[in-house]
């Protein structure tokens, strides 16, 4: 019997369609009994993780590799929690080891699960992806013109409420979902629905609220009962309602190249439905296996999830429903679909890659918000899952703009001036918006100054790329020293004030 689901409009039906510590308490832990990687492959994976962790000063990595639609490799490295002397990254006997049962905050990988929750409801005929938001939340801007599909693929036009790559002091205090929607989803749109693409967490807060409106249940309960439990995930927790916190990794960040510092916690409800899950690498891998096997949803649902959305004029977005989508070259000489999503939240970075037709996946979870360990590891591990090593993992689709030569020179000159002053322990607060100014504490300034001192003189600042997001202009800049390069992620508000000025190592 063929089943049908209403994924489109009421008139259109679609057929069913991964630095091992030297001390014994912190030896890397693995489930070797279920590890079919051969000795050479396992050694290559271990060497890659160990090298990248040591180079980037990352406390812990948890890694899962899926091959043949089965978890083929599951291993954790390093310290889930550092000793109280956090000025020293090398784990000591008082550090808590990471294990394969350690949970990490997965950040925006959570969006994959929110998209799945919506698709469960679509599969059951309880909503259509082309229902307008007004059916559930009529008070929101553009609600009668924006569809649920446009929420999930980021073509709605709603501004991103959580665009900073740090947690402002105001977001360390509790909020409510309704307050987020009132403040951010009742503003003018960034563009007309469907006409452009901008990544926005606001879309997924709205989607999570729609789940609650339809089901009459808290979003978390519906997700557990209808997405997680059916595919064997029983060990997750949520940032707002943590269980067994002693099993969770502690997150760390740093200022420039300074020592790891305890990352602040995000206030209650700020992560709702868009970045709130905390999971083991195994749990994320179980989700990936379900995507590969299409075991939770109907085939039309997976087709919708994995199909790249287009703007109204046919432009690319690089995004499906809850996943970035791209084609990537395999070691077999063919092109293969890759679904992936990065996650970054206070103290954590992660990345999930799924290759459905290769029946493979890679999950990389870390408790360091600094450095790009996940991307570095992904590039080194691609051959293990049948992808050409030279192939890059792919950057997020971004709406870019081209500054004039005068603007480009001004951006580079200001960043150069700010860096010169920071190297002297000074901050030009007149250039900073309140959120950014609050991040430059005395501890932060000292860490930056001390870590920059060994680099010598700053020779040049170079603007690499630009992006528009959440009503801000994003600038990626390279800092060129004699023997090293750093990078800046700068976000500017409409008034020209700097909302973010983060300094990190450059891969």
Protein language model annotation of sequence segments:
Residues 467-507:
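Exposed beta-sheet edge and beta->alpha loop/turn motif
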Residues 45-49, 63, 69, 104-130, ...:
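Active-site SXXK
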Residues 367-443:
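Short, gly/Ser/Thr-rich active-site loops of penicillin-recognizing serine hydrolases
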Residues 426-470:
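Short solvent-exposed beta->alpha transition segments
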Residues 36-104, 126-131, 186:
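Short, conserved catalytic-motif segment at the N-terminal edge
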Residues 13-25:
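Bacterial N-terminal signal peptides
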Residues 351-367, 486-489, 498-504:
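Short, well-ordered beta-strand elements
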Residues 79-81, 86, 144-346:
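Short, surface-exposed loop or secondary-structure junction motifs
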């Amino acid at each position: 019997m063929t089943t049908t689901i209403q994924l489109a409009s009421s008139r259109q039906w679609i057929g069913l369609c991964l630095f091992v510590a030297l001390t014994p308490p912190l030896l890397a832990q693995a489930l070797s009994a279920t590890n079919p990687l051969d000795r050479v492959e396992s050694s290559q994976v271990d060497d890659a993780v160990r090298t990248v962790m040591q180079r980037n000063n990352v406390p812990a990595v948890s890694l899962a590799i899926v091959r043949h639609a089965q978890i083929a490799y599951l291993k954790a490295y390093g310290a889930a929690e550092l000793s109280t002397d956090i000025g020293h990254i090398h784990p000591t006997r008082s550090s808590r080891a990471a294990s394969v049962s350690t949970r990490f905050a997965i950040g925006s990988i959570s969006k994959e699960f929110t998209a799945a929750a919506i698709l469960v409801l679509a599969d059951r005929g309880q909503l259509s992806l082309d229902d307008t938001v007004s059916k559930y939340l009529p008070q929101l801007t553009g609600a009668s013109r924006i569809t649920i599909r446009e929420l999930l693929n980021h073509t709605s036009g709603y501004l991103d409420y959580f665009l900073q790559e740090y947690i402002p002091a105001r977001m360390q205090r509790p909020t409510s979902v309704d307050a987020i929607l009132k403040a951010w989803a009742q503003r003018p749109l960034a563009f007309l629905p469907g006409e452009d693409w901008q990544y926005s967490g606001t879309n997924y807060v709205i989607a999570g609220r729609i789940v609650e409106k339809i089901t009459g249940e808290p979003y978390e309960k519906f997700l557990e009962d209808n997405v997680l439990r059916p595919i064997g995930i029983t060990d997750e927790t949520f940032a707002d309602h943590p269980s067994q916190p002693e099993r969770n990794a502690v997150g760390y960040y740093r200022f420039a190249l300074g020592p790891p510092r305890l990352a602040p916690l995000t206030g209650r409800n700020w992560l709702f439905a868009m970045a709130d899950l905390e999971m083991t690498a195994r749990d994320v891998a179980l989700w990936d296996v379900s995507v590969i096997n299409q075991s939770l949803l109907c085939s039309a649902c997976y087709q919708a999830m994995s199909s790249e959305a287009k703007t109204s004029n046919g432009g690319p977005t690089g995004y499906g429903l809850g996943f970035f989508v791209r084609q990537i070259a395999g070691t077999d000489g063919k092109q293969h679909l890759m679904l992936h999503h990065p996650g970054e939240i206070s103290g954590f970075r992660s990345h999930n890659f799924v290759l459905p037709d290769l029946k493979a996946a890679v999950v990389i979870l870390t408790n360091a918000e600094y450095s790009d360990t996940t991307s570095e590891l992904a590039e080194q591990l691609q051959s293990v899952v049948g992808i050409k090593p030279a192939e890059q993992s792919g950057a997020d689709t971004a709406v870019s703009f081209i500054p004039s030569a005068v603007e480009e020179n001004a951006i580079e000159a200001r960043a150069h001036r700010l860096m010169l002053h920071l190297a002297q322990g000074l901050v030009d607060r007149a250039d900073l918006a309140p959120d950014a100014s609050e991040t430059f504490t005395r501890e932060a300034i000292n860490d930056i100054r001390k870590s920059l001192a060994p680099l010598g003189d700053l020779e040049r600042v170079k603007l690499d790329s630009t992006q528009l997001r959440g009503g801000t202009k994003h600038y990626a800049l390279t800092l060129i020293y004699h023997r090293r390069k750093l990078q800046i992620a700068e976000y500017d508000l409409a008034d020209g004030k700097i909302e973010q000025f983060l300094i990190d190592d450059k891969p």
